[in-house]
Swiss-Prot record:
Catalysed conversion reaction: 1,6-anhydro-N-acetyl-beta-muramate + ATP + H2O = N-acetyl-D-muramate 6-phosphate + ADP + H(+)
UniProt function note: Catalyzes the specific phosphorylation of 1,6-anhydro-N-acetylmuramic acid (anhMurNAc) with the simultaneous cleavage of the 1,6-anhydro ring, generating MurNAc-6-P. Is required for the utilization of anhMurNAc either imported from the medium or derived from its own cell wall murein, and thus plays a role in cell wall recycling.
Organism: Gloeothece citriformis (strain PCC 7424)
Protein name, UniProt field: Anhydro-N-acetylmuramic acid kinase
Biological process according to GO: 1,6-anhydro-N-acetyl-beta-muramic acid catabolic process; amino sugar metabolic process; peptidoglycan turnover
Amino acid sequence: MYCIGLMSGTSVDGIDAALVNISGKDLDLHIELIAGATYPYPPALREKIIAVSEGVSLSMVELAQLDDAIATQFALAAQKIQKGHPQAELIGSHGQTIYHRPPKIKRGEFSQTDLGYSLQLGRGEVITDLTGIPTVSKFRIADIAAGGQGAPLVPKVDAYLLSHPTQTRCIQNIGGIGNVTYLPPRNQENWESHVYGWDTGPGNVLIDLAVQKLTNGQKTYDENGEWAAQGKPSQDLVTKWLQYDFFYQAPPKSTGRELFGHEYLDKCWTDAIALQLPPEDFLASLVELTVASIIHNYRAFLPQMPQAVLLCGGGSHNLYLKQRLQENLGHQSQVLTTDEVGINGDYKEAITFAVLAYWRKICSFPGNLPQVTGASKPMLLGDIHLPISQI
């Protein structure tokens, strides 16, 4: 079955689209990437999404308009990705997160008022209507209803795409926010029950915001990490910035621009100004914060350090970040990209939501891992929207 996965993360770079051919059932799947592309948001829409994600209030009319505008962009991405390719029969659309609130109390101890909440805009109903293709959306809310974080949702797919027979691996996504999937070797007894995952902290978000600030909006990211590579990180500042409750919170945990956005960057910027750091040192320090937060999470919360760390997401192209991660991990872990083991790192999350949609509609197979999200039980993820021709 040809399926389209659509994803836009906290970087709000645009909509990642993946057209994949999926066959099989449940965990016995064959997945082939046919095409992948990223379709940038119109600049004004991107700015509005970022503002709302960081707490700017909207009227109900404005929220509805934003919801429809995002859905339209997702539908256009689905239409574009399949041009020249076989007709897709299913779309899995994550939508655009504009608000994420983790649950207040650990699983088993909460009341209904303590449940988390996560809002993704880009209604599946609109995507179905514009494309004529069945669409699965709203993947996170079922896990949240069962007491989970609603995130991360990629680990179950990671486990069957990227686990190794004998090697312990971490799949480290570096989007706007960083998240890790810990994969024990498949030769370990009951290995699936020892797959873990959580958000590690800032990925690219602070680096990108800093580049925009330093260039007055002329640039949106540091290509290949070349600017930061010219600088020297301030270890004193990195140590100070790491004294943030989220980094020491045990999993399950998730975060977003609510914690690591403009407000957090402004604090970092004030610290850098006090030390008279040049721009390249400031950027190098923010890269070091991402690296240090990843390694802190590994050492504090993993059962053991991984033999390999596989990077994906936009940050996998930041060669300076990759270098610093390898230098800080030392010889105990080899840092690679998922591309180097056969999975396109730019579209891995889009592929994930195609698989989650396939599991939901075709297999009626749970897509979450309770030990990852903190949910009380496995859940079917996503709402199914059918075109009128299939009702």
